[in-house]
Structure formats: C-alpha cells, structure tokens
Amino acid sequence: MTPLDKGLDKARVLIEALPYIQKFTGKTVVIKYGGHAMLDQDLKEKVMLDILLLHSVGIRPVVVHGGGPEINSMLTRVGKESHFVRGLRVTDKETMEIASMVLVGKLNTEIISLLNRFGGKAVGLSGKDAQLLQAVKKPMKFENSQGELEDVDLGFVGEIEQVRPEIVISLVEQGYIPVISPVAGGEDGESYNINADTAAGEIAKALKADKFLLLTDVPGVLRDVEDKDSLLSVIKEDEISGLIDLGVISGGMIPKVECARAALQGGVGSVHILDGRIPHAILLELFTDGGIGTMFNA
C-alpha cells in the first residue's frame, strides 16, 4: 500500500465518522469503564484516548469506573479473608475501607492522571462528593432449605436511593471530564459499595444521557454464545424479556441487560454493551456505520 493509499484510507475513516460527530456534538455520553480494559496498560491508554477524542469534538463524556479485581488483589495482599453468602461477598467495615481506598484513592487517581497526561481536563469524584450518590443498605433475601425467605446481611453493600447530579452537570458545563468512583454515602454517615454498572446507569438516568456505554469482556449479546459471529447489533427494549425467556440473554449478561433496560426507561437515549478488550472500542461503536457491540434502544 502506497503512502497515498494509506492517506486515503484515513480520510475515508474520518468521512465515515463525520455524520456521527455532527450528531453527537453537545450530547452527554456516560461510559462505564471496567473489565480487562482496566487491567491492560495499552488498553487503558486507548480507552483514555477515545474519551479525549470524544471530548475534543464537543461530546460530553462522563466516566464511571469499577475495580472489583483490584479490590480482590488488595484484600489478598493485606491478608483479609473474604466471606461469601450465596456467592456474594460480605462487605464488612474493614473491607469497605479497603474498597474505598482502592476505588477512590488508587484507581480514580490513576484514571484522571492518565487523562490529564494526554491533555484532558479530568476531575475525580466519588459518589460521596456533593452527595452525588445517596444509598441505603441493600436488602437481600434468600430462600433457605425450608423454602422460606430469610434476610441476609451483606454489610456495606448499597442500593442507590437518590442521585444529585448537579456537581457533574457543573463540571461538564465548565469543560471538565468527571471520573466517578462507585462509592456512595448514606444518611447514617457510612460509605456503601455500589455495583459499578448500577451506579453508571443511575447517573446516566439522572443526566438524561444520550448514550450509555458499558465496557465489558464480551462482544455484546450473542444469539449463540459459541458463535462470535452471531452478535445481535440492535435490540429493542420490548424484545428483552423474550430474549431472556429464550435463554439468548442468560447468566451474567442478564443484570447488564436489565441495567440497560432501566436506563432506557429512565430516559437514556440508547445503551451499548461492547467489548472493551478491542482497541478503540468506544470510537468503533460510536463513529462507524456497523458498530462493534449491541445497542439497546426504545
């Protein structure tokens, strides 16, 4: 391929992206950043560059990050034994302190530092800042051996009760990129760990975001999980229940899709589940005709 051919290919890519850039300029896009894309340094940098490109063309990105693997690693390093009930971690006071340290003190700082190093204007927040996320202890009930429902205390695992998005709106309007850790405050003064997908979805609803992107370690929704070419590129909200009943949406994909459905019902324009392991996945999903993941819309 000659230098001219390479240049023409780049020009075609830019022209393909142009109508999408024009369409999304001035719009709010909430990005849930998690999975393998948080662990691989090269992918980290590519995600940050994608976010900065969105910001540079007038799109308003808001980032909400997870950090489960990093929390697990830190618990192991400090010798903190984890206790589980029905597969769910019990988050006691010490575990919550470690989770806050990792999410707010380490990961959030790393993300904003990387964005700023590449020329961005990123500001780190937790859900406790300006009472962005208010939570209560998440009630959990499980069926015991007698078939009766009983309450289970998982500690400082929270359920979002209220979102106060004013601080995020203010930062976005001033040209900053908010980066948010999923740690919420409660009226009892305690900190609560919030599922990052849920936190991102609730923030997207509160902002009435035009798009909500979930970076995952899967391509999206596959009609056949054994066939990577069976990706469902578009799913309507009213098709979700049927696909769950058919088993097309199953296992760990169900809570992500339910999160997508809740966001749509809360006024978000569209939700995208995409594979964050693919370099520049965000740009490929938003700025190309075919996209690379599954888009949910009303």
UniProtKB/Swiss-Prot annotation:
Q: Which cysteines are joined by disulfide bonds?
A: none
Q: Name one GO molecular function term.
A: ATP binding
Q: Which reaction does it catalyse?
A: N-acetyl-L-glutamate + ATP = N-acetyl-L-glutamyl 5-phosphate + ADP
Site keyed Transition state stabilizer: positions: 32, 256
Enzyme class, top EC level, equals: transferase
- Please tell me where this protein is predominantly located: cytoplasm
Subcellular localization, per the record? Cytoplasm
For this record, the Gene Ontology CC terms, alphabetical, are: cytoplasm
Q: What are the BP-aspect GO terms? A: arginine biosynthetic process via ornithine; L-arginine biosynthetic process
InterPro entries per the UniProt record, alphabetical: AceGlu_kinase-like_sf, AcgluKinase_fam, ArgB, Asp/Glu/Uridylate_kinase, Glu/AcGlu_kinase, NAGK-C
Record EC number:
2.7.2.8
Instruction: Decide whether keyword Protein biosynthesis is in the record.
Output: no
Keywords assigned by UniProt? Amino-acid biosynthesis, Arginine biosynthesis, ATP-binding, Cytoplasm, Kinase, Nucleotide-binding, Transferase
Pathway(s) where this gene product acts? Amino-acid biosynthesis; L-arginine biosynthesis; N(2)-acetyl-L-ornithine from L-glutamate: step 2/4
- Identify the residues that bind substrate: 67-68, 89, 193
Q: Which family does it belong to?
A: Belongs to the acetylglutamate kinase family. ArgB subfamily.
* Function of the molecule: Catalyzes the ATP-dependent phosphorylation of N-acetyl-L-glutamate.
Q: What is this protein called?
A: Acetylglutamate kinase
**Which organism encodes this protein?**
Desulfitobacterium hafniense (strain Y51)
The root-end lineage is: Bacteria, Bacillati, Bacillota, Clostridia, Eubacteriales
Task: Provide the gene name from the record.
Answer: argB
